[in-house]
């Protein structure tokens, strides 16, 4: 185990704007503000988020995915429906997200209910992906054992030969999900671990939010 005395205690920080975010009255405008700042300060993938799900035994899984859209209906990402995450969401359509923007010393935690996006939404997003990524979606049997990298590249080449000309359609097993929040927590690092933390809560989508300030 790491020697605790070797870990430096934080006494200073750099952060985003100095506005008091704890005065925000609803979460989506605050998220938009923070996400806009993260787009300017993060070295890569400010839309990266940890996605937590549970399997049918209650054992949790977590992995990084990329948010591909958000509005007041929720946060959207895409993947294979047969993947581990897809199967777990089919069995238990609830999930948690975490955005961590280290450059701003901020994080946003989200908990909510999950619904599939429409075929029209999935088609529209898939059409924006680079062709090589589209081919990879056809070739990948996500979350299944893979013999070798070469075998994967062969599978991609086989699919590419079928779509030399024209558009690549969306695979039927590839789609997206929308997480509609019932909890959104905003956390901002402060010196000496005296952080600022607020949570917005509601019982269901469409209902008004209640804001609670939390001990750090």
From Swiss-Prot:
It holds the Pfam family PNPOx_N. Substrate binds at residues 68, 125, 129, 193-195. The keyword Flavoprotein applies. It catalyses: pyridoxamine 5'-phosphate + O2 + H2O = pyridoxal 5'-phosphate + H2O2 + NH4(+); pyridoxine 5'-phosphate + O2 = pyridoxal 5'-phosphate + H2O2. Its cofactor is FMN. Gene3D superfamilies: Electron Transport, Fmn-binding Protein, Chain A. One of its GO terms (biological process) is pyridoxine biosynthetic process. Belongs to the pyridoxamine 5'-phosphate oxidase family. Catalyzes the oxidation of either pyridoxine 5'-phosphate (PNP) or pyridoxamine 5'-phosphate (PMP) into pyridoxal 5'-phosphate (PLP). Homodimer. This is Pyridoxine/pyridoxamine 5'-phosphate oxidase. It comes from Bradyrhizobium sp. (strain BTAi1 / ATCC BAA-1182). The gene is pdxH.
């Amino acid at each position: 185990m790491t020697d605790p005395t070797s870990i430096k205690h934080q006494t200073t920080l750099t952060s985003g704007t100095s506005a008091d975010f704890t005065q925000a009255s609803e979460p989506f405008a605050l998220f938009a503000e923070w996400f806009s700042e993260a787009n300017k300060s993060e070295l890569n993938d400010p839309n990266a988020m940890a996605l937590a799900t549970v399997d049918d035994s209650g054992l949790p899984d977590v992995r990084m995915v990329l948010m591909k859209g958000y509005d007041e209906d929720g946060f959207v990402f895409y993947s294979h429906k047969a993947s581990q995450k897809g199967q777990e969401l089919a069995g238990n359509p609830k999930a948690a997200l975490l955005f961590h923007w280290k450059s701003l010393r901020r994080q946003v935690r989200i908990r909510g209910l999950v619904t599939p996006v429409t075929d029209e939404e999935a088609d529209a997003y898939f059409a924006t992906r680079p062709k090589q990524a589209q081919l990879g979606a056809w070739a990948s049997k996500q979350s299944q054992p893979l013999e070798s990298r070469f075998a994967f590249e062969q599978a991609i080449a086989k699919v590419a030969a079928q779509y030399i000309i024209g558009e690549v359609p969306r695979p039927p097993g590839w789609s997206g999900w929308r997480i509609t929040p019932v909890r959104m927590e905003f956390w901002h690092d402060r010196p000496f671990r005296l952080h600022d933390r607020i949570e917005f809560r509601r019982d269901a989508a469409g209902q008004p939010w209640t804001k609670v300030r939390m001990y750090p």
